[in-house]
């Protein structure tokens, strides 16, 4: 069964340093403590875009073993608290929340003949 994940996409904040402080010091520990049923969390910082400055700054992916586990987490008091905090700290506008099913494609290294 593929992994299910909650994806949170944060717009570029007006003050990157202030956002990073609250994200690292408050939000990540809160998410780790309150999001029940998760199996891992991947946090990505967006460095740029081929078109110039990227409109988004961070992507958080929280993995769950099933859609039922993700839904139970989102409906829980801890899940609601963590999601509300994500909205509160998003200093560049409202974050985007997505539910996704992951597919993985693995490539092997080939040698040109």
Question: What are the language-model segments listed below?
Answer:
Residues 1-113:
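Macromolecular interaction modules
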């Amino acid at each position: 069964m593929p992994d299910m994940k909650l994806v949170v996409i944060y717009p570029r904040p007006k003050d990157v340093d202030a956002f990073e402080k609250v994200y690292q010091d408050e939000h990540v520990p809160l998410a780790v403590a309150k999001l029940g049923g998760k199996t891992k969390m991947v946090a990505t910082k967006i460095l740029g875009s081929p078109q110039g400055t990227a409109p988004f700054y961070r992507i958080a992916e929280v993995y769950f073993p099933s859609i039922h586990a993700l839904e139970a987490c989102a409906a829980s008091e801890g899940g609601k608290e963590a999601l509300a905090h994500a909205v509160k700290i998003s200093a560049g506008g409202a974050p985007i929340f997505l539910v996704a099913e992951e597919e993985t494609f693995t490539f092997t290294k080939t040698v040109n003949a």
